[in-house]
From Swiss-Prot:
Name of the gene: hemH
E.C. designation(s): 4.98.1.1
Protein name per Swiss-Prot or TrEMBL: Ferrochelatase
HAMAP family xrefs: Ferrochelatase
Catalyzed chemical reaction(s): heme b + 2 H(+) = protoporphyrin IX + Fe(2+)
InterPro entries registered for this protein in UniProt: Ferrochelatase (IPR001015), Ferrochelatase_AS (IPR019772), Ferrochelatase_C (IPR033644), Ferrochelatase_N (IPR033659)
Subcellular location: Cytoplasm
Entry annotated with the keyword Lyase: yes
Cross-referenced PROSITE patterns: FERROCHELATASE
Organism: Mesorhizobium japonicum (strain LMG 29417 / CECT 9101 / MAFF 303099) (Mesorhizobium loti (strain MAFF 303099))
Length: 353
């Protein structure tokens, strides 16, 4: 017969405690919002650092390094930083000295933390795949705060190896350096989730109601990827087309009213079509006088939406004969946008909290 041994809970040392580390049984959950990335400034050096990291990612550029690196270092990184820096300067948040993407992603994190106030063991943070704050630094911070589980949320509604997959790659790469790695979950693509489609439709209707004209055509413009990536099995194009189909259905519009295009192509390789710039130009030349463009694939406004669409696409349309142009903002940290993020996070935290 064994006798019970009384243990003073106040005197008991938590299992796994090491100086400078949280107890093994801390049981906290980290929610990590991950966006693409941003340079730290618009000058040549920060732009060079950012573009080097971004364009060195084999998920983004699927060329042999022996072929790509001479092009990257010999041509791209000697010319593109200056041009890209000028583009960023036009949209730069001067008050906070940062890009809008960083401003909005931080705001999303802060608002999500507030919305999850009923879950005291959940910590919300945010990071970038490229640039700062880095995925590695924030993951390490969450672990140091006692998070033994991390829910990663790559902020891309439509999956692509060039975005969602590389965000997950980077997180696991960071965890490889940790002795004590947390359990990991990743929020799946949400391109067809009703809460996302409803948020998009609501945002579009709300912004169209503020215009003094009615667009004849509304374009859903998604960031493109090289066509060979899609041909090899990347589901991104199918996800984009399904988002537009569901959005069209929700808004009650036909295929001529709401169309799909792809933007931001880079290099001479064929990318997903139809191209946004070519479509906008053709609409203007064909006599269409009023259009609006929305970017469902971007969780927050950034260089590709504010400058490439808000400025370049508008100029292209006007030069081609168009009259009225509107760029509908991304969901950002709006009420609609935060509803989507909170809904996805709460669902994926099931069983953990």
């Amino acid at each position: 017969m064994t006798s019970a041994i009384a243990v003073d809970p106040k005197a008991a040392k938590p299992v796994g405690v090491t100086a400078g580390h949280a107890p093994a049984g801390a049981g906290k959950v980290g929610v990590l919002l991950v966006n693409l990335g941003t340079p730290d400034g618009t000058e040549f050096k920060p732009m060079w650092r950012y573009l080097r990291e971004f364009l060195s990612d084999p998920r983004v550029i699927e060329l042999n390094k022996a072929i790509w690196y001479p092009i990257l270092y010999g041509l791209v990184l000697t010319t593109r930083p200056k041009k890209s820096g000028a583009n960023y300067a036009r949209i730069w948040n001067q008050e906070r000295n940062e890009s809008p993407l960083r401003t909005y992603t931080r705001a999303q994190s802060e608002k999500l933390a507030e919305a999850l106030g009923d879950l005291p063991d959940v910590t919300v943070d945010w990071a970038m795949r490229y640039g700062n704050p880095s995925t590695a630094s924030v993951a390490e911070r969450l672990v140091a705060q006692g998070c033994d589980r991390i829910l990663s949320f790559p902020l891309y509604p439509q999956y692509s190896a060039t975005t969602t997959a590389t965000a997950n790659d980077q997180l696991f790469r960071a965890l490889m350096k940790l002795r004590r790695a947390p359990a990991i979950r990743s929020v799946p693509p949400y391109y067809a989730e009703p809460v996302y489609i409803e948020a998009l439709a609501s945002s579009i209707e709300r912004h169209l109601a503020t215009l003094d004209f009615e667009p004849e055509v509304v374009i859903t413009s998604y960031h493109g990827i090289p066509k060979p990536y899609s041909d090899k099995g990347d589901p991104y194009q199918a996800h984009c087309l399904e988002t537009t189909r569901l959005l069209r259905e929700k808004l009650g519009w036909d295929e001529k009213k709401l169309i799909t295009t792809f933007q931001s192509r880079f290099g001479a390789q064929e990318w997903l079509q139809p191209y946004t710039d070519k479509t906008v130009e053709k609409l203007g030349k064909d006599g269409v006088k009023s259009i609006a463009i929305v970017n469902p694939g971007f969780s927050v406004d950034c260089i590709e939406t504010l400058d490439e669409i808000g400025r370049e696409a508008a100029e292209t349309f006007h030069h081609a004969g168009g009259k009225n142009f509107a760029h509908i903002p991304c969901l950002n940290d709006s009420a609609e946008g935060m509803t989507v993020i909170e809904a996805m996070v709460r669902r994926e935290l099931s069983g953990w909290v």
